[in-house]
Amino acid sequence: MINDDDLCQEMLHYLRKIGKSGMIDQIVSRKHLDLKKEKPQILQKIVRESLQEELNYIASLPTSIETDDFLCIHAGIENKNDWQNAPLSSFIEKRDFQKIGHCLKKYVIVGHLPTSNFYQSQIKNDVLMDFDKKIISIDGGTGVKFISQLNALIIENDGKNLTFKNHFVQPLPIYRIKQDKFVENKESHKVSWPNFEIEILEKREEFSFCKVIHTNQMLWIKNEFIYLKNKHFYCLDDYIDHFITVHENEDVKVIGLYGKFAYIIKNKEIGWIESGYLEKI
């Protein structure tokens, strides 16, 4: 994408749609480059020259790391014994690995797709372990998802057994709950990749009642998470309409304050409360 002149348009698409806050985006910002005005070929050349040292280092790295117990690879492998005999794209772009699986006797550790993509009704970015398929997914969505975390998978081997632990970093501000707020338990609805297009059925001051076009799911979406593009409405990113019960003196992480409501994380439970129940620590 950076080194191949024929892929200069792909790099432009990456910057506009995917690569927010990555090193390519940082160069564009530092050089004050305008994506709308710069020719793709010139843009690609500037980025390539600015990141030559980093690109050389990345090019020197192996595509996979293999031990007796594990294979570490970016996106996945083909479901065959000679998985090495496959296009590079299958290692770095494979989207169906968790579904199709592999035939190795060892664990395959992958990233690429954020783990939150695999949950239908909740936003959850933890390390995902499928012991039956021997697949461990560690991508917490950092740099891609609005709500994300940086995961670390810790593997301990005492010579007889493997032990898995995980740790994560999620630098969000902490607030304290001022008083109890009970919310009736209802079914939660989630908007997630790749189905972000919506139809607004009813708009109110804080939330709009919407239908997800490709799933026909109905839910209330905070107005700040709705945007218009080419005469179509979309949800900004992964979103959940869940409201959370909170108790006095509990500490919660705040994703954001939006009007009269706050998007919070309480013990890894993600959802909404009225912002009046919060005080900053």
Locations of regions flagged by a protein language model:
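Active-site neighborhood of phospho(di)ester-bond hydrolases with catalytic His/Asp-centered motifs
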Residues: 1, 72-73, 106-116, 137-141
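Active-site neighborhood of divalent metal-dependent phosphoester bond hydrolases
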Residues: 1-62
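Active-site-proximal segments of metal-dependent phosphoesterases and phosphodiesterases across multiple
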Residues: 76-100
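Short, surface-exposed loop/helix-turn segments at secondary-structure junctions
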Residues: 85-93, 120-132
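Binuclear metal-dependent phosphoesterase catalytic core
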Residues: 131-180, 184
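Beta-loop motif signature
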Residues: 172-193, 197, 204-206, 214-217, ...
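SH3/SH3-like beta-barrel superfamily modules
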Residues: 191-221, 245-281
